[in-house]
Amino acid sequence: MKKNWFHKFEQSSSKSQKIISTYNLLKKKFFLRKVSDSKSIFLDKEEINFLSNFFFENSSYSDQFLRVSNALSEGWACWVTLDDINFEWNFYLEPIDELSQIKHLLINNKFVFLSALREDNFFQKYLKKESLNIDLVMNFRSNFIENKILIYVPPRQMLPNNPMFTKNILDKSKKLIIFSKGLTLFLSDDVDLKLKFATELASIYGKRVLLENIPLFNNEILCASYTWWINNSYCIKSPEQIIIPLLPIPSVEEPINALTVSHNRNLSKDWFREFLLPEAIQKLERSISPLRKNAGKLIILDGRAHKRKWGRLILKSIQPSKQINYMLPYD
């Protein structure tokens, strides 16, 4: 952030002037590269090398500059986001492989990993690939009697690339809500789809429709992103049904996801099954866990759930569960 660049030296000092000049030069360059509505700028090798040298040469300027210099030298993923309102830019860094940052500590020490998932098989495989032996795996039971989640995937459901997909899922969702007595949750990380769905339903159900707000009554309709729901579900009554229009495969439009995929591809790894699929299963698992309390319904309107092998694998990972072939009014 800008404050991390200008907080220490007097404005008149030569070092300060050099840093200010570099900041403004990069700002101009990044805004000239801006494409349509995208707020993210991917950096090429030349730009990364320039930033690496700059932060290394000025690492004594602040602890923040030193940390950035170290991160770049270790090959962290980096990208820039643009703030159109304030005409500023922010520089982001994130490790592609978090475990590699602490592996030297794990080799000679005992460690305990905690997972939010009921059974985290992907992470166990990940540790074994890194030659980190697991001595004991403990799966704790829930503090309530787990009921089977009822999974409904409409037959012959469209794929997301079908031009009629959005209209189709909106029409189906409206029918599913008509007979619902309890809370209906619509989950989507696609911002446009989430807003469109909330707007369409609000024109029918008015104030019953909420956009990422805590519901106060049983029969409300909540539209939210996965992250918002995971962070707030503890204070919300278990939904009667959760409607998922798109399986939560991480978007490669997000810089960290795109850079991780590129990194894994360069290493000839199966980037989909080793990165995107585990991330999707983990996000889905955490999002639907409240349904185990009341045997709630999970409705998946993404045709890939049946038509793709990995989609069927995601369905199989939801346990305990029971797939149903139809929905009955007030069932």
Regions found by a protein language model. Give the residues of each.
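Conserved helicase motor
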Residues: 188-192, 208-218, 223-231
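Short, structured coil segments at secondary-structure junctions
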Residues: 107, 130, 205, 237-238, ...
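Short, surface-exposed basic-aromatic patches at helix termini and helix-loop junctions that form
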Residues: 128-129, 199-206, 216, 234-240
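Conserved RecA-like P-loop NTPase helicase motor core
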Residues: 157-158, 218-309
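Short, acidic/turn-prone active-site loops that include or flank metal/cofactor-
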Residues: 137-142, 213-215, 226-227, 246-250, ...
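Generic recognition of flexible, low-complexity loop/linker segments
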Residues: 98-103, 171-175, 211, 229-232, ...
